[in-house]
């Protein structure tokens, strides 16, 4: 057997001697910030990062197959899978999954929903926008006598994992009939590929409802809902409400820091907050490429945080970043 030696990263390995290119693929949830980071990084260093938004399932498959330099997933891999496939996992950014609607005359944040009502809509039990339960919660809104058009993801998706994980915590009917996962058997609705596809469908189709990462909602000028959290408060998606949820995370208790941030406590917490994770092969066939990937994320953690905040993502806390960098030194090998 070939002897394995530790791949040691120090800050001294990070300066950029010459231009290089790395490739990544996976979650569409963080695509807006990864694209922004890649643009800023290339301007500053000359190094290129090519990231393809193909969904978390595809990102996991491609890093396992070693067809990309890094994978990205919003559905954190469990300890046994990380060990089985000899992968290293760490969080890169935090954001929010938001239900969005296309209802004429109803502006962002005005429609109130509880988690239970949201589940019943996606189960197909609530079929009309003027359903009595929706009207009771929104007595002043002009809810139309129109069928609700449900839009969900058609691909393996970490955004779907976060959304269905939340609904499984809120609704026993959802947990028993649909459950959670990157791909589930939907009981109603039609599918769009990627956050991009869901956002496009909701934008085009009146009386529809879907779920996307918050940056996609803003970029597509979609109306998000006000969602009731565990504390009983109706909150809107924002950098602050995502940060409130993330403040309760116990990063160091999970393998690969794979925390789930849905339905967190706190009066200001957004109920469907999620971290997005990077996956690297522990044993690299090309140590120089691994070094280049780490250089990019080292740059993102130290110089890309303002860009993350501008796009309404939450940067990874400094103490967690310190742990991540220690993890790079001890777990990545060649």
Swiss-Prot record:
Listed InterPro entries: ABC_phos-bd_PstS, PBP_domain, Phosphate-bind_PstS
Q: In which broad location class does this protein mainly occur, judging by the first location in its UniProt entry?
A: periplasm
Cleavable signal peptide: 1-19
Q: Which domain of life is it from?
A: Bacteria
Protein keywords:
Periplasm, Phosphate transport, Signal, Transport
Which cellular components does GO assign to this protein? ATP-binding cassette (ABC) transporter complex; periplasmic space
GO annotation terms (biological process) = phosphate ion transmembrane transport
A single GO molecular-function term is: phosphate ion binding
Q: Where in the cell is it found?
A: Periplasm
A Pfam family annotated for this UniProt entry: PBP_like_2
Residues the record lists as binding phosphate: 27-29, 56, 74, 157-159
User: Family, per the entry?
Assistant: Belongs to the PstS family.
Q: What does this protein do?
A: Part of the ABC transporter complex PstSACB involved in phosphate import.
Name by which UniProt lists this protein: Phosphate-binding protein PstS
Organism listed in the record: Haemophilus influenzae (strain ATCC 51907 / DSM 11121 / KW20 / Rd)
């Amino acid at each position: 057997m070939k002897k394995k030696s530790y791949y040691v990263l120090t800050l001294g390995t990070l300066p950029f001697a010459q231009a290089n290119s790395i490739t990544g693929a996976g979650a569409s949830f963080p695509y807006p910030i990864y694209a922004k980071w890649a643009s800023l990084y290339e301007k500053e260093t000359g190094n290129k990062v090519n990231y393809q938004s193909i969904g978390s399932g595809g990102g996991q498959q491609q890093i396992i197959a070693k067809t990309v330099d890094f994978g990205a997933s919003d559905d954190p891999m469990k300890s046994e899978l990380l060990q089985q496939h000899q992968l290293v996992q760490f969080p890169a950014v935090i954001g929010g999954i938001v239900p969005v609607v296309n209802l004429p005359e109803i502006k962002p944040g005005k429609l109130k929903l509880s988690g239970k009502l949201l589940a019943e809509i996606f189960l197909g039990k609530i079929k009309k926008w003027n359903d009595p339960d929706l009207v009771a919660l929104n007595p002043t809104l002009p809810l139309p006598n129109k069928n609700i058009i449900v839009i969900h993801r058609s691909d393996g998706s970490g955004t779907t994992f976060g959304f269905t994980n939340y609904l499984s915590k809120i609704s026993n009917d959802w947990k028993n009939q649909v459950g959670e996962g990157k791909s589930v058997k939907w009981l109603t609705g039609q599918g769009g590929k990627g956050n991009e596809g869901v956002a496009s469908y909701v934008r085009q189709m009146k009386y529809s409802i879907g779920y996307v990462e918050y940056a996609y909602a803003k970029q597509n000028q979609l109306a998000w809902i006000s969602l009731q959290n565990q504390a009983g408060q109706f909150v809107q998606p924002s950098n602050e409400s995502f940060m409130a949820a993330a403040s309760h995370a116990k990063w160091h208790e999970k393998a690969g820091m794979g925390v789930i941030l849905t339905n967190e406590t706190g009066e200001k917490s957004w109920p469907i907050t999620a971290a997005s994770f990077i996956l690297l092969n522990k044993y690299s066939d090309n140590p120089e490429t691994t070094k280049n990937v780490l250089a990019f994320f080292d740059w993102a953690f130290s110089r890309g945080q303002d860009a993350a905040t501008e796009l309404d993502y939450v940067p990874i806390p400094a103490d967690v970043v310190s742990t991540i960098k220690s993890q790079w030194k001890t777990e990545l090998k060649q």
